[in-house]
A protein has these predicted regions:
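Basic- and hydrophobic-enriched, low-structure N-terminal and domain-boundary segments
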Residues: 1-142, 146-151, 193, 484-485, ...
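Short alpha-helical interface patches
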Residues: 42, 48, 59-112, 207-217, ...
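A broad, low-specificity signal for short, low-complexity segments enriched in glycine/proline
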Residues: 93-101, 112, 116-126, 146-147, ...
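P-loop NTPase motor domains
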Residues: 130-423, 438, 442, 498, ...
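Short secondary-structure boundary/capping segments
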Residues: 176-177, 200-203, 441-445, 469-474, ...
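Short loop or secondary-structure boundary microenvironments that flank
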Residues: 357, 361, 401, 429, ...
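Conserved ATP-driven motor cores of ASCE-family P-loop NTPases powering translocation/secretion/packaging/pilus
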Residues: 415-517
């Protein structure tokens, strides 16, 4: 802005040379008459401003005037002060809601992402040159679900991936989405017998995908804040898991590629501490594979794992079994035996994928972590290799309870590249401290990658301070009063200006629950009402508008099984895994079905 002002001043100075020369030529004929002649002749010359007569003094007069003009400009520049009246201590102020909304909205209401009651932003990012990555922070009861998540689900304008504690969003908006033509899929970790199945093995395209799966699994099953002084056991356990997965990936039939089969193989790898020469059925399985293909990647990892003593091998197996112990449950084994989710389809047609997790138990959240990672991989791959870099259907991740699910360490880098592929996220947190705890070093990068930040209110002091600093300082006028007593007493008033935060941390804490503070990159902050869900045109199809609640059905699945005898004759057979088609069942039949497969 300073450079622009300097260029404007220079242009005015150059243009000013023209009237200076013109006036000098008017004065030149009277120069020889002295000062009195000039004073008498100039008014007459001004009556005929374009009757310019060249004379012997014309050049001299022009030079004198130009020299004087130049000296005047020089004096002005040397004494010029850089004033910003009314902005001495800061220029922060609230943005104009209507103007900002017009700048970013799409005229058609349903084509937008809803931020506040009067501000929405188009998913056409090439129009406004902002991404639609959003951080939403609000304490318990501030309306993260009611004022942000639900209204955007009701827009029905993208594919959705929704982390849904308690299943509230699914129940309230599922019927609406089906009425709008969506395929609704549910990964239900609360009532697994009602869930669609999710098998991570289906989405393993190459060796790198296997490595990512194992790395993410170990990270997601590591308790928060725990640190191992000796990473050997986890490293060795990951080598064993890689060997088992690579074997299934390349040697087993498709229906046997799942975590229940991994558990069966692990149980078949008996280790006898008193007999180092003992060969388990699993040892024989890999020995046969080595005879067939010594360079097989599964063999390499198994030999690396198997290089220790029997006691060490048993400890490694126990370490891995502890990581995978949830897959011993028949409900989770059934859920992961096959796959119904078809993750790539979210980028090709409108699909709503809900991941239901208990709000008071994080035991199964590792599966959602794996789901997130594979979704990003699948959608990015689909965009790059099939659709020229942009998905035909935008995919919106509504990450409620963001802090409860482990994400890749390079999540900040994933954020920076998803925009161009028509993928966006809404990170929903209770306070800023949660983000700092998850990404101690990258949290600022994550905040910086999101062009929208919506604050709904809360009680965490660090968040109050952060929001106050983002709002900036304004310059305000103040006055002070003085009083002198005595025989000659008087009053005095002094006027001055000073700086003040647009909102102090205390004022941020006291934010009215009806209002939200919105930041959009490159715009003044906005103070606006939270979105009133009852005014949405589709509210009649939700439970908030007395519409039907959505009830997803029960899925009947057989748990994968494998029998490894000492001889291993036939190794893996097609009969070792029974997978039946599922059907939606009534609640009355549910208990009978569960008992049948126990």
């Amino acid at each position: 802005m300073k450079n622009d002002d300097e260029q404007s001043s220079l242009m005015v100075a150059v243009i000013g040379i023209i009237p200076v020369i013109w006036f000098a030529l008017l004065v030149a004929p009277y120069l020889s008459s002295g000062l009195m002649g000039i004073l008498d002749g100039v008014p007459e010359a001004m009556n005929h401003p374009f009757s310019i007569r060249l004379c012997g003094d014309s050049v001299k007069t022009v030079l004198i005037f130009l020299l004087s003009y130049g000296m005047g400009i020089g004096i002005y520049i040397s004494t010029k002060k850089h004033y910003r009246r009314g902005e001495e201590h800061g220029s922060a102020k609230w943005g104009n809601v209507k103007k900002i909304n017009r700048r970013y909205r799409e005229k058609r209401f349903t084509k937008n992402k809803l931020l506040t009651m009067h501000v929405r932003i188009s998913y056409n990012m090439r129009k406004h040159l902002r991404n639609v990555l959003t951080v939403v922070i609000g304490g318990s009861g501030s309306g993260k679900t009611r004022f942000f998540a639900k209204p955007n689900l009701m827009q029905a304008n993208t594919s959705f991936v929704v982390l849904d504690p308690k299943g509230e969003n699914l129940r309230d908006t599922g019927y609406l989405l089906e009425e709008k033509g969506y395929e609704v899929r549910v990964l239900d970790l609360i009532n697994m017998e009602k869930s669609h199945c999710y098998n991570p093995f289906v989405y393993l395209k190459d060796d790198n995908d296997v490595q990512r799966l194992v790395t993410n699994l170990f990270k997601a099953t590591t308790p928060k804040g725990s640190q191992s002084n000796d990473p050997f056991w986890d490293t060795a356990a990951s080598m064993l898991l890689l060997a088992l997965i690579f074997y299934l990936q390349y040697e087993a039939p498709e229906e046997e590629q799942n975590f229940p089969m991994v558990m069966e193989m692990l149980r078949a790898g008996e280790v006898r501490e008193d007999d180092d020469q003992y060969q388990s059925p699993l040892d024989e399985l890999f020995e046969r594979l080595e005879m067939k293909n010594p360079e097989h990647i599964a063999v390499k990892y198994y030999k690396d794992y198997h290089s220790g003593s029997a006691k060490t091998l048993k400890s490694i197996q126990i370490t891995l079994a502890a990581r995978l112990e949830k897959f011993n449950l028949s409900s989770l084994a059934a859920l992961t035996a096959t796959d119904d989710l078809d993750l790539p389809s979210l980028g090709e047609r409108k699909v709503a994928l809900f991941a239901l997790i208990p709000d008071n138990d994080t035991s199964y959240n590792f599966l959602v972590s794996i789901l997130y990672t594979q979704l990003f991989q699948q959608l990015f791959y689909l965009a790059d290799h099939k659709y020229g870099g942009r998905l035909p259907v935008h995919v919106h991740f509504l990450m409620d309870e963001f802090a409860n699910v482990s994400l890749p360490d390079d999540f900040d880098k994933i954020l920076s590249v998803m925009r161009s592929r028509e993928v966006s996220v809404s990170i929903i947190l209770q306070n800023l401290a949660q983000l700092k705890a998850l990404f101690e070093k990258q949290w600022e990068s994550i905040m910086g990658n999101c062009d929208e930040f919506l604050y709904l209110g809360g009680n965490e002091q660090g968040t109050h301070k952060y929001v106050s600093e983002l709002l900036g300082k304004a310059t305000i006028d103040t006055n002070t009063y003085g009083k002198l007593t005595g025989h000659s007493g008087n009053y005095s008033t002094n006027y001055q200006n000073t700086g003040r935060e647009l909102m102090t941390p205390d004022e941020v804490r006291m934010l009215d629950n009806r209002y939200a503070i919105l930041f959009i990159r490159g715009e003044r902050p906005i103070l606006d009402e939270k979105f009133d869900i009852l005014k949405h045109p589709n509210v009649g199809l939700t439970t908030d508008g007395n519409g039907k609640p959505y009830l997803h059905g029960a899925v009947d699945r057989a748990v994968a099984s494998i029998s490894l005898g000492d001889s291993l004759e036939g190794e893996f057979t097609d009969d070792s895994l029974e997978v039946e088609d599922y059907e939606l069942l009534s609640d009355e039949d549910l208990e009978e079905i569960i008992q049948k497969y126990q």
